[in-house]
Design a protein with these regions (language model features):
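Amphipathic, Lys/Arg-enriched alpha-helical "gate/interface" segment within cytosolic domains
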Residues: 2-130
Length: 130
């Protein structure tokens, strides 16, 4: 599976890693797994690392379900999502997704964050856990 994750119970942080070619279906499958995972507690923070992704097979029209999925994340008790997207392709794609979610749900930018560096990621994560 191109996106795997583990849940840190003590910090309520989901650390996910995407690899290889990632499609919209694989992202949707991953998100469904998070929503259905009964071990994940309310107040979780999701961190997804796209550093080792070789390509994203995603189109704008395929992103249409994502704002609705955000509703399910909120119902599950998501505190924030942080996407580490260091390449131009991944950063641009996830900024597009971030905008779609923010427009649909009037989500504050600090709840759905896309960062380009590990340093930004660690700063944001410390801020959210505190």
């Amino acid at each position: 599976m191109p996106i795997t994750y583990h849940y840190e119970i003590d910090t309520k942080v989901i650390r996910a890693k995407a690899t290889d070619l990632v499609s919209t279906k694989e992202i949707l499958d991953y998100v469904t797994n998070i929503i259905e995972d009964t071990k994940i507690e309310k107040g979780f923070i999701e961190v997804v690392d796209f550093q080792t992704v070789s390509d994203l097979a995603v189109t704008y029209s395929e992103l249409d379900p994502f704002p609705y999925i955000w509703e399910k994340y909120m119902k599950k008790g998501c505190k924030a999502v942080v996407i580490y997207a260091p390449t131009n392709l991944s950063f641009g794609t996830f900024r597009m997704l971030q905008t779609a979610v923010m427009i649909r749900h009037e989500v504050a930018e600090n709840l759905f964050v896309v960062v380009r560096s590990k340093e930004e990621l660690e700063v944001k994560l410390k801020e959210l856990i505190a």
